[in-house]
Amino acid sequence: MKNQFLNSYFQLITTIFLISSITIAAEEITSTLKVPNGFKVEIFLNNTIEKPRGITSDQDGNIFIGSGSTFAYFVTKNRKIYTIAKTLQKPIGIDYWDNKLYISSVDKIYVVKNVKEEINKSIKSHKDYTWKMQIFALLPKNNSQMHSGRYIKVDSKNNKLIVNIGSQHNVKIPPKKEAVILSINLKTKKEEIVAFGVRNSVGFDFHPISNEIYFSDNGQDGLGDNIPPDEINVITEYKEHFGFPYVFGKNQKNYGFYNKAPKNTKFIPSIYELPAHVAPLGIHFYRGNNFPKEYINKLFIAEHGSWNRSSPVGYKITTLDIDSKTRTARNYKTFLYGFLKHDKSKFGRPVDIITYYDGSILFTDDFGNKIYRVYYEKI
């Protein structure tokens, strides 16, 4: 009896110690991350999802997360996690609209046609339930595995799904259906090229006023620490050419390729040049009511961070003010930083950002396997 009591006691003490250690570790992480006065950072999910990438949510606070592995996930607002799928190929892109969930893989897009029904089945099931889904569209195959993930976003006003098809190479003249952004009609499934000359966009969003598509683009590697700039662009007309591989940034010539550009091609310059190699992924216009008024419609940028620069840059979330009438960008500022340590090591890499139902923002971190929540408390 005495031994049983001692065993139970030591198990309890061990459990308390582990919980305390996890809590302390989480507090150390969030205290390291710096945000403007009045904002707070918390870990929303910690090491429970492998390589979280794309993130979306419904009006009830349910969250849907893609990944750089083979899994896609559903998370309740109470932070209980369920599996949507287990065997997809790099399902980094995911978006919810009108009770449907669209999920990308490297060569397909899937659709879950009744999300509420699948949510109920997941919650009621006592076993590992995977959701019923269908193939929505086939995508061009990527044979190199470079830039093979497909970011997606629903254009609800035009009833279209927007999809990136990145270049299979660091820099090379691409075939017609590569280094482009596509649109797919949600009803007819008709495809149309939205933009040419986009090396690899892993983030786009629709301006809340104009509904025009703004997107990030990652510049090529191998030209040095400070060129080419990464980019923020805006699409004003379909089928415009944004330069890759012939020009970059505000139409700076990419020597070795510029002379090979198709004759009479008009290149659209970026509206903002980000520092080279910060690797902008998800971008998001804030649409909530929790942040101060000056943040409404502000563009948030998830800078994933450099990997081949002598001094690392990025690893943070930045913001830009976008004028929807003039299509200009200004006031580039750091909003959240701290993932990059003084010794140049890092413990997190931001990927994708959304406004959550309560007015906070959530962002994914595929390096630390975490979801973070940033909210505002009045000072």
Swiss-Prot record:
Its main location: membrane. GO terms for cellular component: membrane. It comes from the Bacteria. It is a single-pass membrane protein. InterPro entries: 6-blade_b-propeller_TolB-like, Glc/Sorbosone_DH, Quinoprot_gluc/sorb_DH_b-prop. Coiled coil: none annotated. To A.liquefaciens L-sorbosone dehydrogenase. This is Uncharacterized protein BB_0024.
